[in-house]
Amino acid sequence: MKNLLIICDNFPPQSGPRMGYLVKYAKRLGWNSYVVAAENKSRNDLTGLSGYAVETYVVPQRRHRKWNLLHILHFFWPYDYLRGEYEIRRIASEIVQRVKIDLVLCTHTYGWFPLSAAYAVAKKANIPLIVDIRDLVEQNPKIPFFEMSFNQKMDFLRDKCSFLSNRRAVRMHRDAAALTSISPWHAEWLKRWNRNSFCIYNGFDPELFKPIEPVKSNQFEIVYAGSLATKRQRNPELLLEAIVQLDRSGVISPEMFTLNFYGEPSGSHVLPAARALGIERYLKFFPSVPITNLPEIFAKASVLLLLGARPSDFRTHGVMTTKFYEYFASRRPILLVPDDEECLGQVIRESGAGWAVRTVEDTVSCLTTLLEQWKATGVVSGNTMDGDRYDLFSRETQASQFVEIFDKILNGTMVPGQIFNGTDKIEGD
């Protein structure tokens, strides 16, 4: 067995499914994992991913006043003392001294924490470092400063002020043996820092989400599961306007057509928009349900809904919501409204998983076709993608792709500049 040291900003059971599934499935592929993670107070229940690492250490974050001296200095300095980066480094160094670690893997989002600790440990012990970047500042739209929230303004100022941190972070990414990220857009962007940049998608739990036989229903049910965030991020206008047209033309009625939201019982920004159009009777809102109950809900759905943002309103890059993978696993048809005109819409179209629509007319046409099929058979048929395409997005495949990169690094057969986009294999020299 080879040994992997993971240094991360969160880890199950609180959060961090990407690393949690890697640890679980990499063990089956010959890799033991040692984990040093920062404390995360998220309420996610990922207890099913606990216990697979050989050792797991959770470093608590320090309590502090929001604007004490350390907090202000963090604007300019790369070490995140407030989140326990020194303690993470100390524990990781102790592990390296008593265990033969083959690779160090650091995963981070905005702010690069805890990359400094991982870089220092790997460099001192002369161990290859892999950096997994889950988010980049550059993926977000450029919002005028006066339109930013207070927290966004603070993040913007910190990014401008912390030039020492920024320069050092670029060097650490360049020195890494490889970079990985969550979408082809991210991997391509990261080539500016490191030619060995690879896309490894997130995915679904193959032991929980499996192909589902559709259940006949006397109602055409569109299901949305998850947070509605803000209107700029989850814009329902195209779908609601399409429902207005179908209602006025007599194609649908509340008795045979419903749009159900799970996770936002208040209706968030969607319910007021529906009321303004006079179609609130078609919508129902429910509280969040345990993840284990989702497959049953998906089985009863005619269509699974993903809400995106109009590119002109909120131009994000490379965002692949985890909800897509759970929908994808069920093989129920997916409707993305509106098309993000990027990675998510492209994957949905190319995989045959569903539809990504850009106009009200497209939405009406799509729903009309699906309604005709439902009226004739009582169900809407799912996608018929081949097994290889389906397996591409499982967490088990994700782990095997990580392990393939690990082995290439240790064997010295990595091809500089090649992008692993999830469909092509990494070839040796």
What does each model-identified segment do?
Residues V215-P236, L240-E241, Q398:
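Conserved donor-binding/catalytic core segment of Leloir-type glycosyltransferases
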